[in-house]
Amino acid sequence: MDHENLMKYLEEFRSIRFQPDFQKVDAERNVRYCEITDFPISNISFELLETGVSQQWRNCDQNLFNEYLKTYKNGGYSQFEDLLFKIWGYSEEKERFDLPALKSFYRKMSEIVGEDEVLEKLARLVRITKSACEVLPEKIYRLVGDIESATFSHIQCASLIAWMFFSDTPRLSFIIILQKTTCVAVEKLKFLFTYFDKMSIDPPIGAVSFRKMRITHKQYLENWKLRETNLLPDVQVFDKMSIEETALCTQIDFANKRLGGGVLKGGAVQEEIRFMMCPEMMVAILLNDVTQDLEAISIVGAYVFSSYTGYSNTLKWAKITPKHSAQNNNSFRDQFGRLQTETVAIDAVRNAGTPLECLLNQLTTEKLTREVRKAAIGFLSAGDGFSKIPVVSGWWGCGAFRGNKPLKFLIQVIACGISDRPLQFCTFGDTELAKKCEEMMTLFRNNNVRTGQLFLIINSIGPPLNYSEQYVFDAIRAKINSTKA
């Protein structure tokens, strides 16, 4: 995203705020765990639900951390591993197991930066973990029931994430990563320790908000009726820009319904990479369980700590570069201390079978409606006033979930029409398909196709007899041209 566009969007943000806007929202439903200028820490009356975030740090023997920090310079790797097992509750040698990824990280990093520096990295993690009782409140509410959002300082996020090293609950910790034997697991530890180094030495000052966007089907229909006759949104297609290079916008996370996907396991595709670049996003895993069809998750203000190269099995950690750090500009913070970039997690339908069967499934009215509605819920998360602030997305649900790329592009065009926002669409190097997307938008503009009309056209094209990735584009083009004849 170039400097000129960033300055244009920054000017727009003088009069708008990503949600939660603490000047307007219900303070009891939108919980502030940190002090924000003019807005104190929330004082709420809800009883802590059984699904509140575990406060295991309050039951931990702090002497274990204190003893480690007294002697870590001489204790080597084995002392840190011993600390982990003691916190996990595996005091007996026979109960313990190998942590190959952690051992490999220690060995490889010792060869690069020296063993003393690696020991310092481990000690920084322990100090952040130890600080949890001081910086975190006694009650942390998950995003369930009446609770809509949670806002933490960057420092508080670090304490929560550090504790994920010392928890042995697989779904909420790094214990599976530590037991992996893959190169990707070692790279994930590089991302994490880069994060803890930064948070120990030069932490950003500000806050991050996590919000569950809920909408009823009735509310969705009201938005649909309001905007179905609108012209389609402005769409720009980029074959070289990636979503994470942008700022002052809404970036789309191609999410799993369990937020983070395989980030705490072996996964290393779009969602997992985003969470590794911005580890603060993992706090959302602690706050949310399974995202439902009428829900989306918004994260506002996450800081980017690392860059990367590769994808999936070839993922490599890289030192942060200007290309990926645009959103870290402190001049982009709002009055609540949040960086004004939003990441919205929306989960797609998972398809199975042959390519033809996958396409047929997606073209059913039920699945088409579900995907348009899910995307629209995410794109609507910012609220009113964002008609000039882009949604930046790409091939949502087109990898492991086997979505059809042309169809997913059009679904997101419709969703941006419903939410009255421009779309910046990244095709990740697929120049040919980028050109076809642009050609379709030209066709729509030349024929004054409206938001609701495009949905009806897609819903009426009928199933293909044989599979072609371009079937949806070809069928729509034929239908539009036939109406002109």
Swiss-Prot record:
| Upper classification of the organism | Eukaryota, Metazoa, Ecdysozoa, Nematoda, Chromadorea
Q: In what tissue types does this protein appear?
A: Expressed in head and tail neurons.
What's this protein's function? Answer: Poly(ADP-ribose) synthesized after DNA damage is only present transiently and is rapidly degraded by poly(ADP-ribose) glycohydrolase. Poly(ADP-ribose) metabolism may be required for maintenance of the normal function of neuronal cells.
Q: Which gene encodes it?
A: parg-2
- Changes seen on gene knockout: RNAi-mediated knockdown results in increased sensitivity to gamma irradiation.
**MF terms (GO), sorted A to Z:** poly(ADP-ribose) glycohydrolase activity
Enzyme nomenclature, EC number: 3.2.1.143
Which is one Gene Ontology cellular component term of this protein? nucleus
The consequence of Y311A is:
Little poly(ADP-ribose) glycohydrolase activity in vitro
Has the keyword RNA-binding been applied to this entry? no
Name listed for the protein in its UniProt record: Poly(ADP-ribose) glycohydrolase 2
